[in-house]
């Protein structure tokens, strides 16, 4: 999706950045959807709903379609200022916001394990299921970085330095996400 990200950056880069706090690149959902629309139009035409990975697993367990705001922030289809799906960004991808999941908090109990899921997995029917969130924010949280000024260093396939703040720092060179803790953020490299 490099060509699609490059085109987005050239034509809509500033507008996308103002809403998503990220520059168009191959890691975001928006250019990936455009790639799918251009390269696999039949498959794209069959899309009814768009799930993020963890949300699909949770849907299998609960029959509830939703995602958390941190996951949404990583899609480049979400207005981080208004904390909602952005119709114009969705239109760039060739979709509408109603194809995307309702937004909830990562800690919200969104449903319970259904009978069908219990039978398929061995999990106890009726077990409460929370929304959950992205891997990196949970790594930041689990490392103990839960106060302004704390820093985490992630050494993995994709290493990151994350500084905990009480506001976003929109910068073309940073990746900005909300923290798991209300009112905090973790912009980083």
Predicted regions and their residues:
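Glycine-rich phosphate-binding/catalytic subdomain of phosphoryl-transfer
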Residues: 1-189
């Amino acid at each position: 999706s490099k060509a699609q990200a490059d085109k987005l950056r050239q034509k809509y880069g500033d507008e996308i950045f103002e809403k998503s706090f990220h520059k168009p690149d191959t890691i975001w959902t928006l250019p990936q959807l455009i790639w799918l629309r251009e390269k696999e139009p039949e498959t794209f035409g069959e899309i009814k709903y768009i799930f993020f990975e963890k949300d699909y697993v949770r849907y299998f367990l609960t029959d509830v379609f939703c995602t958390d705001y941190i996951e949404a922030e990583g899609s480049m289809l979400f207005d981080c200022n208004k904390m909602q799906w952005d119709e114009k960004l969705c239109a760039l991808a060739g979709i509408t916001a109603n194809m995307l999941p309702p937004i909830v908090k990562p800690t919200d109990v969104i449903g319970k394990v259904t009978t069908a899921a219990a039978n398929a997995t061995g999990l106890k029917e009726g077990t409460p299921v929370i929304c959950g969130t992205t891997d990196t924010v949970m790594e930041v949280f689990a490392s103990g970085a839960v106060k302004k000024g704390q820093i985490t260093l992630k050494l993995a396939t994709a290493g990151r330095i994350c500084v905990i703040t009480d506001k976003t720092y929109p910068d073309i060179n940073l990746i900005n996400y909300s923290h798991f803790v209300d009112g905090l953020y973790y912009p980083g490299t």
